[in-house]
From Swiss-Prot:
Chief localization: cytoplasm
Localization terms from the record: Cytoplasm
NCBIfam families: MnmC_Cterm (TIGR03197), PRK01747.1-4 (NF002483)
Gene that this polypeptide is encoded by: mnmC
Taxonomic lineage from the root: Bacteria, Pseudomonadati, Pseudomonadota, Betaproteobacteria, Burkholderiales
FAD-dependent cmnm(5)s(2)U34 oxidoreductase: annotated span: 259-652
EC id: 2.1.1.61, 1.5.-.-
InterPro entries reported in the protein's UniProt record: FAD-dep_OxRdtase (IPR006076), FAD/NAD-bd_sf (IPR036188), MnmC-like_methylTransf (IPR008471), SAM-dependent_MTases_sf (IPR029063), tRNA_MAMT_biosynth_bifunc_MnmC (IPR023032), tRNA_S-uridine_synth_MnmC_C (IPR017610)
Reactions mediated catalytically: 5-aminomethyl-2-thiouridine(34) in tRNA + S-adenosyl-L-methionine = 5-methylaminomethyl-2-thiouridine(34) in tRNA + S-adenosyl-L-homocysteine + H(+)
Keywords for the protein's UniProt record, in alphabetical order: Cytoplasm, FAD, Flavoprotein, Methyltransferase, Multifunctional enzyme, Oxidoreductase, S-adenosyl-L-methionine, Transferase, tRNA processing
Protein name: tRNA 5-methylaminomethyl-2-thiouridine biosynthesis bifunctional protein MnmC
Length: 652
């Protein structure tokens, strides 16, 4: 069962003071609140500690009203010697609703900078669903990652290298003991050597736990009558960690080759360019988005299951991350076509609707994420006599994939060089560089990093023996304007129907594993029509000869476990050579092919997974906090197939 989020509450007492059961009294004086937050900065050695750094990461154990984040952001803005990119990761078991946060933040706003930052935070405040939420500010130079969920659980799942810690003192029945020994051990797991901390807690058990896990401890008075601040740094006398926190990949130059200019590859280009990388994008077709990414539209929605399994959590993270990235593209002037009236997932039977209801009840998600529609509500929404209810995703819908790709390439600007109509025959490794070579053995590009985002051909280029991809033929059908009843929003179930802007209705799609025939088939159109007529009775009227219908054939490449392949590729040869020693290994123990990454196997969920996959790879390259929890990173890890082979004694 998923952990349901319980939001913090806020009320105003008769004396005018804002109070919260989770946070107690909120300060009524903005200058006092700012001074309190600034003490935490000074206690961790900021801003001096981040100067001259490319990236700097702060982890906070309780976000609350965001006062410490806002003060840190303001200090970063005011410092001309600031780090290039500031990451702020905050654990929050009980996030405020947006309106309550607005009231709480109003107590803290004291100057123009804080006010502007607070407005930006409120505007970007995420939906109340569990997991990691990544928000970007100041053109991506300030990154806030909110971890909504239990403090201990989220810290255990966090993949990061922390340079400083703000340790909240939120010992309440609502929060539990957020500075328990288990929590502090989890903090030590992600601490960089020399990482600093500051806390207002003077609990002896907290001090003991800090010292037992490698942190020093001392009290600092400020001379202003405030309680002493406890500060220290991570300086263990012995190594206690099996795995060190992630570091940036050491490269001679920040250059990369991305192979494949569909949704996966273009998203990687945009994320790397945003971090200052220069990219050579190689596409075998004459145009970008020429394979499945070239479909007129694709549906976009998360999955929901009662147990909130890996697929549910991955698609939720991908869905929310894509929404944020697309909004950023649009705000930067790179708009593309996408629907704005939500999307309905209709149940296929009474039992299917019961499963949807169970999943909806288990997650307890807010209405801006999903609503449950009974049969009558679904009929009223669609104005069609549907047989069952379903789920309404108000931010789901249909998206023009090629438009997304074009927007991402435009955002990358001069940092990307496109080689279209160019086939990569093989990859060669020369010292610390990768070389992409064509069939005539001519070098197309050289770089220390290669990202394979070319679907089915990625396995061949990487020489992977333990990753199997399967092609699935999908034929969609285009029904001419005037041949169907109006459909207010994209609708899916057993099949899907998407109204396009010109009045055409896109329906589909067939699912034909291991079929690589690109020829349009009448049988495929008939299958699509039958499924949508069953899903949405009364939608499709009389049609001309089926043989005259337009459509498109594309291929989705899927992995056996239906989870994408994202991240650093395993060095299979070295893994096989050390099979006995690695038989009980975790993914983090496996050798990797230096600088070689994969972003493929997205199947029919490229719109959901591409932006998140790109952010994951860029974060891995830069040694930044990852946008996914540890078990989800492991779920998409390209090395998972080699791990299974090693554990099953299939090799060695």
């Amino acid at each position: 069962m998923p952990d349901r989020l319980v939001p913090a509450t806020l009320a105003r007492r008769d004396d005018g003071i804002l109070v919260s059961p989770e946070y107690g009294e909120l300060p009524r004086d903005a200058s006092h609140a700012r001074a309190h937050a600034n003490r935490m900065l000074a206690g961790t050695g900021l801003p001096a500690h981040w100067r001259g750094r490319r990236t700097f990461t702060i982890v906070e154990t309780g976000f609350g009203t965001g006062s410490r984040f806002l003060a840190t952001w303001a200090a970063w803005r005011d410092d001309p010697a600031r780090c290039e990119r500031l990451h702020f990761v905050a654990i929050e078991p009980h996030p405020f609703a947006r309106d309550d946060l607005r009231r709480a933040v109003s107590n803290f706003v004291a100057d123009t900078t804080i006010s502007e930052n607070a407005d930006a935070l409120l505007d970007a405040w995420p939906m109340h669903v569990p997991g990691l939420h990544r928000l970007e500010f100041d053109a991506g130079r300030v990154v806030l990652t909110l971890a909504f969920g239990d403090a201990h659980d989220m810290l255990q799942r966090l993949v990061a290298r922390a340079d400083a810690f703000y340790l909240g003192n939120l010992a309440s029945a609502a929060h539990g003991d957020v500075l328990s020994a288990d929590v502090i051990r989890a903090l030590a797991r992600i601490a960089a050597d020399g990482a600093t901390y500051a806390t207002h807690s003077h609990d002896d058990a907290v001090k003991h736990a800090l010292e037992q896990t490698g942190f020093t401890s001392r009290d600092v008075e400020d001379g202003a009558g405030e309680p002493a601040l406890r500060v220290g740094e991570y300086a263990p006398r012995w190594r206690m960690r099996r795995h060190e926190p992630p570091r940036a990949l050491p490269v001679a130059s920040r250059e990369a080759i991305v192979i494949g200019a569909g949704l996966a590859g273009c998203a990687v280009v945009e994320r790397l360019a945003a971090r200052g990388w220069n990219i050579t994008l190689i596409e075998r077709h004459e145009q970008i988005a020429s394979e499945a990414s070239g479909n007129p539209a694709g549906v976009f929605h998360p999955l929901m299951t009662r147990d909130d399994n890996v697929a549910s959590r991955l698609t939720r993270s991908g869905f929310l991350h894509a929404l944020a990235r697309w909004r950023a593209l649009e705000e930067a002037g790179h708009a593309f076509a996408r629907s704005t009236r939500g999307m309905i997932h209709l149940a296929e039977s009474a039992d299917d609707f019961a499963r949807m209801r169970d999943a909806f009840d288990a997650l307890g998600a807010p209405s801006d994420y999903v609503s449950l529609l009974d049969t009558d509500a679904a009929r009223a929404h669609l104005n069609l006599p549907v047989a069952h209810g379903g789920l309404l995703f108000p931010h789901g819908g249909a998206v023009w994939p090629a438009g997304v790709c074009a927007a991402q390439i435009a955002a990358a600007g001069e940092r990307v060089k496109l080689l279209a109509g160019t086939e990569v025959a093989r990859l060669e490794r020369d010292r610390d560089m990768w070389r992409a070579v064509d069939a005539a053995s001519a070098t197309l590009a050289e770089a220390p990093v290669v990202v394979l985002a070319n679907a089915g051909d990625a396995v061949r280029l990487a020489g992977l023996r333990h990753v199997a991809l399967q092609p699935v033929r999908g034929q969609l059908t285009l029904l001419p304007p005037g041949s169907t009843a109006p459909l207010p929003c994209p609708t899916i179930g057993d099949g899907y129907a998407v109204p396009l802007d010109d009045g055409t209705l896109l329906i589909g799609a067939t699912f034909e594993p291991d079929d690589v025939d690109r020829t349009m088939r009448t049988a495929g159109h008939i299958e699509n029509l039958e499924r949508v007529r069953h899903l949405l009775p009364g939608l499709i009227g009389e049609l001309p000869d089926v043989d005259t219908l337009r459509g498109r054939v594309a291929f989705r490449w899927v992995v056996a476990d239906r989870v994408p392949v994202i991240g650093p590729l395993a060095d299979e040869a070295q893994g096989v050579a050390n099979a006995r020693a690695l038989s009980g290994a975790k993914a983090r123990d496996l050798p990797r092919a230096a600088g070689l990454y994969g972003a493929f196997g997205y199947g029919s969920r490229g719109l959901v997974w591409a932006a998140l996959g790109a952010e994951l790879i860029a974060s891995q390259l830069e040694g930044e906090p990852l946008p996914l929890e540890r078990e989800l990173v492991d779920a998409v890890d390209p090395a998972r197939f080699l791990i299974r082979a090693l554990r099953g004694r299939q090799i060695g």
